[in-house]
Amino acid sequence: MSRVSQARNLGKYFLLIDNMLVVLGFFVVFPLVSIRFVDQMGWAAVMVGIALGLRQFIQQGLGIFGGAIADRFGAKPMIVTGMLMRAAGFATMGIAHEPWLLWFSCLLSGLGGTLFDPPRSALVVKLMPQQRGRFFSLLMMQDSAGAVIGALLGSWLLQYDFRLVCATGAVLFVLCAAFNAWLLPAWKLSTIRTPVREGMTRVMRDKRFVTYVLTLAGYYMLAVQVMLMLPIMVNDVAGAPSAVKWMYAIEACLSLTLLYPIARWSEKHFRLEHRLMAGLLIMSLSMMPVGMVSGLQQLFTLICLFYIGSIIAEPARETLSASLADARARGSYMGFSRLGLAIGGTIGYIGGGWLFDLGKSAHQPELPWMMLGIIGIFTFLALGWQFSQKRAARRLLERDA
């Protein structure tokens, strides 16, 4: 085995261990934020939506800057610093008794994510030149298992004190920072040492990539509801916060049994864009009836459909984003690819929280879910138009040649 192949093989296992620590640290805390502050402390859902949206927007919206800096200085210092900032954000969240302090904790958490997320994604692109889609599927399976373990641990700790929940998340991110500081080599992310401004400019001039990323905002408006409206809905229907962990258990079971087989089968028979659109359509249609159900079994059935759509769409979305990235500025591209999540996540959290409160006060609980479903359908149509334009341009070039 060549030294390059050996480094990539070891890097794969490093990425899997690192990813598990990050997922555990995140899911111990964030699925319970809406339960803690809306259900236990009686805050309006929009207040918590602002906090979650702020974290999402800062982490993903500023990702291009984190990625561009990592292109210039390397992955290691950015990852270690970002994880320590995330730990500080969780520690602050544990003592939040006013909205501004919750918002500040999410600000710190988001800034940490801005620093560590793009270089981690770029390392996957760098180390997995072949079978990248399958590795993204493995990471998603790991995400699902880690989400359940984290949510179970967080739910158990919440019975005693929310500060224990946040302290556990903070400790896990400190451990992750130490793991990276100790074992992560000083790898460069890009094929050349790209100046910060040049990397950002290269992305902004790539109109096809920019349009694709911004269109995905609609996809993310639906996807982020697993952190806000779906846990609140499960809690309302079940009458107990402990039921939320079963929502993540469903995701884990589906991911561990279906994600990798579906990814392997579909990559042989369908284009990436078709897989993304099919998954998005299933997610959109499963959202629409959520506000009309009154039983936990019906709700979990719709959540199953939503997760199946995500299982189909997410590996294709991640692989498509990576395949469109320029190797000369990987960090910048992977950072900018998070902008759709920043915009869609922020609107999804704040708008979703506002619509949830509005629907509740107007006795129209189906309102936010129908709106999200319609947004998903429009995003599906927009992506279909983009992909058809790309195929038409390719056929024109082939004909001219």
From Swiss-Prot:
Membrane disposition: Multi-pass membrane protein
One Pfam family named in its UniProt record: MFS_1
InterPro entries listed in its UniProt record: MFS, MFS_dom, MFS_trans_sf, MFS_Transporters, Multidrug-R_MdtH
Record's keyword terms, sorted: Cell inner membrane, Cell membrane, Membrane, Transmembrane, Transmembrane helix, Transport
Segments on the Periplasmic side according to the record's topology features: 34-98, 159-163, 234-242, 297-298, 360-366
Gene3D superfamilies noted in UniProt: MFS general substrate transporter like domains
Cytoplasmic compartment residues: 1-12, 117-137, 185-212, 264-275, 320-338, 388-401
GO molecular-function terms, A-Z: transmembrane transporter activity
Transmembrane residue ranges: 13-33, 99-116, 138-158, 164-184, 213-233, 243-263, 276-296, 299-319, 339-359, 367-387
GO cellular component terms, A-Z: plasma membrane
Protein localization: Cell inner membrane
Similarity comment: Belongs to the major facilitator superfamily. DHA1 family. MdtH (TC 2.A.1.2.21) subfamily.
Name assigned to this protein: Multidrug resistance protein MdtH
Species in which this protein is naturally found: Shigella dysenteriae serotype 1 (strain Sd197)
Gene (name only): mdtH
